Regions:
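Short, Lys/Arg-enriched segments at the junction into DNA-binding effector domains
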Residues: 2, 114-146
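N-terminal/domain-start alpha-helical segments
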Residues: 1-120
Length: 146
């Protein structure tokens, strides 16, 4: 799977990157919400791990932006904020799952696998659409004629 990690805490971001790469995933990591949201709307990902507390825009706003651009993209909130209100806000913003820190690595990997299975079972919207001599690449957000 191609996974986008959005986590401002450097040691956790690097640890998650190493863990997921060792498990065979391709990982792109960002520490700030705005560049991560831009990346997640421009590029194709199979899953997003998203922290709630980020230095520029919060994870709720990143989640909303990603959800608008990619309705079927699995998003797992991974955050220290574990109140009922925080969990409900994350899920209402479009997160598919919510895991509080600290977490067990096995549980995180199981949740990633579960979201991946669910996404694989759901037919995706076409990434490339062709009509009347025009080609729209929704994954790259480009259009060309001919």
């Amino acid at each position: 799977m191609r996974i986008l990690i959005v986590e401002d805490e450097r040691s956790l971001r690097e640890g998650l990157t190493d863990l997921l790469a060792a498990a065979g995933h391709e990982v792109v990591a960002h520490e700030n919400g705005k560049p991560a949201a831009d990346c997640g709307t421009r590029e194709a990902f199979d899953l997003v791990l998203l922290d709630l507390m980020l230095p520029d825009i919060d994870g709720i706003e990143v989640c909303r932006r990603l959800r608008r651009a990619r309705p079927a993209l699995p998003i797992l909130m991974l955050t220290a904020r574990g109140s009922e209100d925080d969990k409900v806000a994350g899920l209402e913003a479009g997160a598919d799952d919510y895991l509080t820190k600290p977490f067990a690595v096995r549980e995180l990997l199981a949740r990633i696998d579960a979201l991946g299975r669910r996404a694989a079972a759901t037919p995706a919207d076409p990434e490339v659409v062709e009509a009347d001599g025009c080609v729209l690449d929704l994954g790259r957000l480009t259009a060309r004629r001919g």
